[in-house]
Amino acid sequence: MKFLFFLLLTLSLPAASKPNFVIIFTDDQGYGDLGCFGSETIKTPNIDRLAREGRRFTSFMVASPVCSPSRAALLTGCYPKRVGMHQHVLFPHSTKGLNPTEHSIADHLSDQGYATACFGKWHLGHHPETLPQK
């Protein structure tokens, strides 16, 4: 959360050029599951290269031990309870989802001229009004 706050705080600072960056958010991954953190069992050459050539943040903590609440926290910069995503993982039959009026990191980055995208598992609502296309 500290990093996300710092990132959003620094978005308004002038810069010669804006850096490109990728946030990789995975479920059920342990610290030692990547080669760049010492795994010899699981081969992760592309992520290892990103870690070697870019910046690695090693002290990030998640706001929840399960995917939907921790995903909501990363995307909004808020505690899961604040955005109503604190109770459980959202499954396809769930009627709740991330409120589309919440401002996400993508919204803030878009305001600063960044092109943003989200690939893979959304898991923050399965109904049209809670999907990221909104």
Predicted regions and their residues:
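Formylglycine-dependent sulfatase
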Residues: 2, 15-134
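Hydrophobic h-region of N-terminal signal peptides that target proteins for export
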Residues: 6-16
